[in-house]
């Protein structure tokens, strides 16, 4: 039907007769001449319909926004003074010879160039929202990322293997989406949270370099960077150490950013231990664009009169830390109160501070409600450690280690960006040497920090039985600008070690056999050393496009309530369908919004 795309027309087409198909972006009537901005996936071109064209002009008069048209016409220069440098086709226009309305359109609920739409209306009319140039750009960029990924992995000997979507329910940290089996009454499949176990089994099978760009499903509370179904670049390889895998994956991410958005990432990525990241940044996903670090003060506050600091310093598992804000002395009381409320979200009970007005005046040059509770030598040591300067402000956190890290870590990022301290550079890094386990206070048992198939660090295997809290893992996370974009590890390839990890997690042998017997059996048949990583495709594309929500880079996403406003899913089903699945709903379980 068409010879060219609208957005691809330029001065090279001058004098040619072409046929275009697309949607009416805008129609204008100027002095009897009708101008149409015709849009397709490549962009917009200006169409001109002259009243002398007695066949086409009456049709053009009927045209409205979002009508679908087929137009044939002559490419010519735009008149002097009407060139539009804002679009690639801005130097030319197409003079209509014939025009056909392929399909009219109802009046759309919004304009395609409206940037202030509510997300609800966008998701309800997603098929229209996807016509908008910004969304077209996002989805096409996503395609470029997946294509570049496939090319890189193919060049490095990886093969694409599909793994099952209907699988067994196994605990991986979030709720499973369950699918009832009609044939096997009372039994359920689970949609995969990841292909973790299957890709390990592929390593046992001898497919030593596997990848898959696959859908994963997690029934969890949603945020801007989470969806109930999401896409993962899943990778596994045999006979490589963690440094080999990290080097290879660095190369892949560098290639993606260079090829897709023309960004050169550093080579190599810096590497930092989990303990160092928490100590310096209060987060295992540090945003290195922010040049602020936490300063340790626990040892200084052991005997100070200020009880809040003293108690946190003396109690096991407590921490006192400081965050210096360059130029923060200009912060108003109102702004400090807002930051105090902010850290309260993370469990902090308050936010002490000291303003540095004039260091030459000693204690007299400082301003703070807590100064009277702190001996001068302690204050001077604090100022030296934080390297505070005149005009700075120092915030303090004093509580359990987790609370201090969470609160000051989040405050560090917030202040860094709000006060213009962050750079505009891309700052990737690897975080390594994660703990194997974290203690669950509610359940009073250890939980796997990553997943229970992560191998312990060399020399840490004995801790699995004696002191799980000391065991480090061979896990590694790739972090970019404060966001985890990929996480992986060397896996356990010996059955005896896997059994020890299950025991440390308080998973009894019979339960382990029931849930993971197939894996334990496979590990006894010559399983090779192996490891891998998974990248969040949605998150990577969102960062490349500069959007805050992965919903802007997914064609048909769900809301934060895991609903599709377009199709009204999830929905009720017919009683007959439930009977076939041997399911009966109790009325007390049925809720309506």
Curated annotation (Swiss-Prot):
Keywords carried by this UniProt record: Aminoacyl-tRNA synthetase, ATP-binding, Cytoplasm, Ligase, Nucleotide-binding, Protein biosynthesis
Stored Gene3D superfamilies: Bira Bifunctional Protein, Domain 2, GAD-like domain, Nucleic acid-binding proteins
Family annotation (InterPro entries): Aa-tRNA-synt_II, aa-tRNA-synth_II, aa-tRNA-synth_II/BPL/LPL, Asp-tRNA-ligase_1, Asp-tRNA-ligase_1_N, Asp/Asn-tRNA-synth_IIb, AspRS_core, GAD-like_sf
GO MF terms, alphabetically ordered: aspartate-tRNA ligase activity; aspartate-tRNA(Asn) ligase activity; ATP binding; nucleic acid binding
Binding site residues for L-aspartate: 172, 218, 450, 491
UniProt: ATP binding residues: 218-220, 227, 484, 536-539
Any Gene Ontology CC annotation: cytoplasm
Catalytic activity from the UniProt record: tRNA(Asx) + L-aspartate + ATP = L-aspartyl-tRNA(Asx) + AMP + diphosphate
Site entry: Important for tRNA non-discrimination: 30, 81
EC number: 6.1.1.23
Subcellular location: Cytoplasm
GO BP, sorted A to Z: aspartyl-tRNA aminoacylation
Region (Aspartate): 196-199
Main location, first listed in the record: cytoplasm
Function recorded in the entry: Aspartyl-tRNA synthetase with relaxed tRNA specificity since it is able to aspartylate not only its cognate tRNA(Asp) but also tRNA(Asn). Reaction proceeds in two steps: L-aspartate is first activated by ATP to form Asp-AMP and then transferred to the acceptor end of tRNA(Asp/Asn).
Matching NCBIfam families: aspS_bact, PRK00476.1
Subunit annotation: Homodimer.
Similarity annotation: Belongs to the class-II aminoacyl-tRNA synthetase family. Type 1 subfamily.
UniProt protein name: Aspartate--tRNA(Asp/Asn) ligase
Species of the source: Nitrosomonas eutropha (strain DSM 101675 / C91 / Nm57)
